[in-house]
Amino acid sequence: MFISFEGIDGSGKSTQVALFREYLERNSMEYVFIREPGGTQAGEDIREILLHNEYKLFPETELLLFMASRAQIVREVIIPALKKKKLVLADRFLDSSVAYQGYGRGLSIQMVTTLNEFSTGGVTPHLTLFIDVPVDVAVKRMRREMKHDKIEMESLDFFKRVRQGYLELAKRDPKRILVIDGTMSVEKIHEQVVKEFLLCLKKLGHGL
């Protein structure tokens, strides 16, 4: 099974990923964890360029770097893990590119989608959990943190476009992408995450 978590920066996504990993470990469920960009040696080098180096990247350059990282991790990590029937847990995957580079940066949605198909080789999560919060809430959370990468320092309008992109994706693919209210308590969100995970496991014919 392949499950991904999505959300705009400041949504609480990373907190929920951490809680879900703890849940899996408590229940002795083996899993492979990946994050985007990164997850491989090549991917981590690309992550450094994308998020922390002082390069002035054009949107097209940024998109292709994300795709390069994704192509590597799909073939090096995800496909081998799925072939071994392992659970794969991703902190961001292909939907991030559509939301951030497509809707956020204004690149062609069709082009981003085509590049996603090429970079993933058609590998798609069985379940994607989108932790949704209003942009003003997310920005307040980010401002409370001391460290910000280049993407987290984008404008309010940028994150509004990204959030709208995620919501559009969820409308188009409601069976895979589930929207979770990120303004609920951390505990309530985690409960819903686990509930949706177990339902998906059941649909796929797996048990805990």
UniProtKB/Swiss-Prot annotation:
One of its GO terms (molecular function) is dTMP kinase activity. Phosphorylation of dTMP to form dTDP in both de novo and salvage pathways of dTTP synthesis. Pfam families: Thymidylate_kin. ATP binds at residues 7-14. Gene3D superfamilies: P-loop containing nucleotide triphosphate hydrolases. It catalyses: dTMP + ATP = dTDP + ADP. InterPro entries: P-loop_NTPase, Thymidylate_kin-like_dom, Thymidylate_kinase. It is an enzyme of class 2 (transferase). One of its GO terms (biological process) is dUDP biosynthetic process. This is Thymidylate kinase. It comes from the Bacteria. Belongs to the thymidylate kinase family. Its EC number is 2.7.4.9. Keywords: ATP-binding, Kinase, Nucleotide biosynthesis, Nucleotide-binding, Transferase. GO terms for cellular component: cytosol.
